[in-house]
Amino acid sequence: MIRTFRHKGLERFFRTGITSGIQAMHANRLRLILAQLDQSKAIADMNTPGLAVHPLKGDRKGTWAVTVQANWRITFRYENGNAEVVNYEDYH
């Protein structure tokens, strides 16, 4: 289950479907990723074909990322079976 968001536009999209805070061309992919993330209890639940889930390194160790498109990612941490600090970012 998704407990907290860092990106307010992504949270608004997740709760209402309003795309004003995200790139509209990413809406369908974001909807798929967020639905999967909200249903997951562990990182293994996110390891489905096409999601490209991967751990981050260095100072971002403990954070996971899912590719949205090109450099855009959904990043998050798991705490007690919940996705926390869910963010929508281009960190490259």
Identify the meaning behind each predicted range:
Residues M1-I33:
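Arg/Lys-rich, positively charged N-terminal/basic patches that mediate binding to nucleic acids
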Residues H54-K57, W64-H92:
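Enriched for short, Lys/Arg-rich terminal
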Residues F14, L34, D38-D45:
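Short amphipathic alpha-helical segments enriched in hydrophobics
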Residues K41-W64:
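A short, surface-exposed loop/turn module that caps and links secondary-structure elements
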